[in-house]
Amino acid sequence: MIFNARKTEGLEGFTKVTGDLTFDQVDINIGDGFDGSSGIFKAPLSGIYRMSFSGQSAAYIIDYTQIMVYKNGYPIFFITDGNEAEKADGNNVSYTWIMRLVKGDELKLYSDNYLYAYSNEPLTFSGELIHIEN
């Protein structure tokens, strides 16, 4: 099981995003666990997974970027980055984590502030099963 998805649309410029992150391009989806239109990953097998998010905070904004990772409808942790100066470039934001999922568990990403993406610098969400459990 492995997936990689990219969000290249809808965040051009200085965009405040509040809501579930969806992904317009799914490059690989072996195991059919990821749905780009909803942004939800549903574990096809129980096991240990390596998950990753990367993106960029919006430029020229003195604020922060915060991505919440939800498991089965409950927030389990936050990915946060502060942009403390009006910079022409946003900050790169990335995080990789390892977690145990049971078959059917659902993960999604939620944003409550500024993000930036376009075709050359997409937001990405990916995951892979690294150990199967019975």
Task: Identify the function of each model-found stretch.
Residues 1-134:
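Extracellular jelly-roll beta-sandwich "head" domains, especially the C-terminal globular C1q domain
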